[in-house]
Amino acid sequence: LRDYEKAIDSYRKGNSIRNARMHYDREIETKKIDNIINIFSQEFIEKYEQNNQPSDQLIFILGAPRSGTTLIEQIISAHSDVFGAGELPYIMQLANGYSRDELSTKSYPERFANENNFLPFLKDDAKIYLDKINKLVNDDSVLRTIDKMPSNYKYIGYIFLMFPNAKVINTQRNPIDTCLSIFFQNFNSGHRYSFDLNNLVFWYQEYVRLMEYWRSVFEKRMLIVDYDSVVSDTENIAKKIIKFCDLSWEEQCLSFYESERTVATASNWQVRQPIYKTSQEKSRNYGN
């Protein structure tokens, strides 16, 4: 059909109906990002990082929704030593203390402003997370396990507090392509910002602000992967990713789309296809 003007108008109308029912508070978003940055300072990380949890099993793939997290997970999980666990809620639940009644009134990141609210439980949080992960894996031969919940970008400091040896991969994509793809996706209420383009741009700017902070703190412990680079130079970028995960190269990582594992993601049909270029600079079709 290629009637892009009509298409974007239809998306606007449909999303406006959803947006009218879901309030997105920009002030709350900004305050949350401010608090995360202020609480999880370099000094804070160095003081509380748990050196007694040496596990190198965990790989976290995170970033904005629709930025390529599923593609990267599929490449890595095609490796014989890797289990892709999908999008898991455990980090968010533990960070907010949802499993502990006494902390139910203290949410993330405010819970971490007072060490009495988190320090006694940090080691337990790490154990709980690993136990949950290992129940999913149930295979002693697996060396690495992937959690690809995109929203874990908010919890990178918490992740490194528990697991200093974790591998964190942040996916990037053309910002306009990312935002349009989010706008076109029929997300649930967990993405209230996604139904209005102005709110979406605001949210994305706050996301970038936080990620730039995390990179300044954990630069040598994170890998930034650009979606467009993966599409245009798949083999070289895939080898770089596998090396970052401390794994030996396997050619099957380039044939990830042949895997029969179940994948629950907004990109579900795409993981059954070879890498394609049609999503690159897709926003050009919609003008300004």
What are these regions (language model features)?
Residues 59, 83, 167-169, 223-225:
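Hydrophobic/aromatic beta-strand patches that form the interior of the parallel beta-sheet core
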Residues 60-78:
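Glycine-rich phosphate-binding P-loop
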Residues 89-91, 173-178, 229-231:
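Conserved nucleotide-binding/hydrolysis micro-motifs of P-loop NTPases
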Residues 94-112:
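P-loop NTPase switch/communication element
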Residues 150-151, 229-234:
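Acidic, metal-coordinating catalytic cores used for nucleic-acid/nucleotide bond scission
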Residues 151-173, 178-179, 245:
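ATP-dependent NMP and nucleoside kinases share a basic, alpha-helical "lid"
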